[in-house]
Amino acid sequence: MSKKLTFQEIILTLQQFWNDQGCMLMQAYDNEKGAGTMSPYTFLRAIGPEPWNAAYVEPSRRPADGRYGENPNRLYQHHQFQVVMKPSPSNIQELYLESLEKLGINPLEHDIRFVEDNWENPSTGSAGLGWEVWLDGMEITQFTYFQQVGGLATGPVTAEVTYGLERLASYIQEVDSVYDIEWADGVKYGEIFIQPEYEHSKYSFEISDQEILLENFDKFEKEAGRALEEGLVHPAYDYVLKCSHTFNLLDARGAVSVTERAGYIARIRNLARVVAKTFVAERKRLGYPLLDEETRVKLLAEDAE
């Protein structure tokens, strides 16, 4: 590889590439979440009959993975570049390999493997066929064809490509520690993020008030239910995300037992399923506006029978 791209140049390159493939460039969703999949731009849009092609960077928080900024590869918060395409293009894997070439990674010169790794997210009732993508022995991407989201079968099938930006940047820049990644010319990743990593880790493992978090979970769950009673999908889903992050904080603090853990996950999943069903009903009521006219009329006629 000749020029070593900065972290932000990697993002810009991927944005331009997937824009050229017809993806809308969305912005990171403004609620804490553990993965880009949990953004409404993936979770909600992967269900129902309407097409959807989007790409976006998603900061992803995983409190239990915090290491006070001392581990070169484990982070409280990392960044994913998320691509969702529905229906899935038949050449999605070829497009992905082409995107690596744009980053200066020639597939013919490197060991790139698709390793089967079917995906499941119990807290949202989602699952799919999947592969990890390994570049010279390091996982850099997760590929998933969604089969179920929010407890609902998907159709048409949505393809999801999730790049781990820190891992990709570490490889491209040939650095061993994420904190040595060059974010922009002259600015290191650690100069931006190592202090937040330390503080969030300290809060998650030492400072957070378990009683307040438990109360918050109950309140967020209740508010999600109230929003759903009024058919308000998006406010309800915001509270599902808040429940999920609050649970992750409780889990990091060691505040939930194995039995309680399953119960909390089930509570989040039940809410996510109702959100998914309500969203599909809402899109139908709106007349599936993203469908082409012929398909829309046909589908609405079939639904009316």
From Swiss-Prot:
It catalyses: tRNA(Gly) + glycine + ATP = glycyl-tRNA(Gly) + AMP + diphosphate. It holds the Pfam family tRNA-synt_2e. Its main location: cytoplasm. It is an enzyme of class 6 (ligase). Keywords: Aminoacyl-tRNA synthetase, ATP-binding, Cytoplasm, Ligase, Nucleotide-binding, Protein biosynthesis. Its EC number is 6.1.1.14. One of its GO terms (biological process) is glycyl-tRNA aminoacylation. Gene3D superfamilies: Bira Bifunctional Protein, Domain 2, Class II aaRS and biotin synthetases, domain 2. PANTHER family: GLYCINE--TRNA LIGASE, CHLOROPLASTIC_MITOCHONDRIAL 2, GLYCYL-TRNA SYNTHETASE. Tetramer of two alpha and two beta subunits. This is Glycine--tRNA ligase alpha subunit. The gene is glyQ.
